[in-house]
Amino acid sequence: MLLADTWYPNWWQALILGMVQGITEFLPISSTAHLRVFPALVGWPDAGASFTAVIQLGSLGAVLIYFASDLRQLILGSWKAWRERDFQQEPWRLSVGILVGTVPIVVAGWAIKAIWGSPPRQLWVIATAAIGLAVLLGWAEQTGKRQRDLHSLGIWDGIWVGLAQALSLIPGVSRSGSTLTAGLFLHLQRSAAARYSFLLGIPALFLAGVVEFISEFEAEALLPQGLGTLSAFVFSYLSIDWLIQFLQRSSTWLFIVYRIGFGLFIILGLALGFLRP
């Protein structure tokens, strides 16, 4: 059950939080961080990790629809590879890479929930993570050769990107940011790294949303969760489409600079007192 002091946003607050979730989930800037900082700026309570995880199901729905064709090819191609016992086929390698790449975040998420209940959401943690990942993304942007596409990916690539995805349990890191960074380090093209990040995120988003919805179920939360999820779906779809097109023609430096500025803004807010830890 939810804690007695859990805050439930009203209908328009839920729509706004869903919009924030949708816009920021797939951009490498951390949706969790923005869902923590935005309410603090406008004077709302923190909706909590459970609300954040549940409305991510809207982002999941957007991925499933946007990449429906890719997913259909992966499923049918993997089934064909299984029947033919040809495990070098591309759909099989991609599918297995996604599955094994999900293991690290599942294990880490279970451990965090068992030990601490939820990840830390203090603003100083978010600021540190935002700047730290920006440095890594900048390094990857500079050193990555960007020669590989999705056709070259194998199971080991899924493992490495999956390990990076587990770091996103730290608020401020960003799941898309950590996986995009890992993809660039593996010399993927920017748009290919983003597409793989989206596909890899499907199991993680599903498991996080369903687990939190079931374990923290409260009838009073259904309306805000539903509205937030719907809003997140719409804005996630638009965000995915924009990012794929953006990375086909531009670098990630826009997000690197934004992350550093975002982290410094939080630090300034904490120092001046207009943000509470």
From Swiss-Prot:
Domain of life: Bacteria
Entry keyword Glycoprotein: no
A single GO BP: cell wall organization
GO CC annotation, single: plasma membrane
Record field: catalytic activity: di-trans,octa-cis-undecaprenyl diphosphate + H2O = di-trans,octa-cis-undecaprenyl phosphate + phosphate + H(+)
Principal subcellular localisation of the protein: membrane
A Pfam short name: BacA
Coiled-coil intervals: none
Cleavable signal peptide: none
E.C. code: 3.6.1.27
Subcellular location: Cell inner membrane
Record keywords, A-Z: Antibiotic resistance, Cell inner membrane, Cell membrane, Cell shape, Cell wall biogenesis/degradation, Hydrolase, Membrane, Peptidoglycan synthesis, Transmembrane, Transmembrane helix
Transmembrane segments: 11-31, 47-67, 96-116, 123-143, 153-173, 197-217, 227-247, 254-274
Family: Belongs to the UppP family.
Function: Catalyzes the dephosphorylation of undecaprenyl diphosphate (UPP). Confers resistance to bacitracin.
Protein's name according to its UniProt entry: Undecaprenyl-diphosphatase
Organism annotation: Synechococcus sp. (strain JA-2-3B'a(2-13)) (Cyanobacteria bacterium Yellowstone B-Prime)
